[in-house]
């Protein structure tokens, strides 16, 4: 009650819903979207995750996910605006203490106009509504965690220079940051280079219970969450 930004809904008993199976759960997957720009390891882990879910009783449904291109592009300036507000007391007054990546994001946010911001908000709300409608036909949506295995430090060094790197990292996370959808990320295997690979289940707003149930059921019959990459 002291936090006016919170939602006054009761917290469910998540443990009570851990049935160990997924009977009666409809899981949607857009195979075109989840395969475009996704490497073989990430695609294989998603497919295997869906196979396990089906074995646990889930119904796998083919869906068409709303085109996320605009909201992915909007995520960067919107993030910049939010970060600029958070750092207003120290940026740009202490700009020389900031690294180039964060400074660049702050500059991007500060460069947006009120008109720019409102257009982003409208596009975000339209996309959020389209995803909400999709959840009238399925209980969960399955997507990769990112388009490739966990990147090495050497690969991450090119973060500001290789556009495909940031795109691959954010392709399957930005859309659900923009909709505010809850997700659970589950380890599902390893790439040939030893990097861990994961996939996600995405749920309806305030239906974290379904995500906890799905994650628990998956991890009861797999042991990827107990394995570690060779270091």
Predicted regions span which residues?
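A short helix-breaking turn/cap at a secondary-structure junction
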Residues: 1-44, 48-49, 67, 221-231
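Short, surface-exposed loop/helix-turn segments at secondary-structure junctions
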Residues: 5-9, 73, 89, 119, ...
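Short helix-loop capping/hinge segments that flank enzyme active sites or metal/cofactor-binding pockets
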Residues: 16-31, 78-132, 144, 182-196
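Hydrophobic/aromatic ligand-binding patch that stacks against planar heteroaromatic rings
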Residues: 52, 174-177, 193
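Small-aliphatic-rich amphipathic alpha-helix that forms the alpha element of a beta-alpha
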Residues: 130-133, 163-187
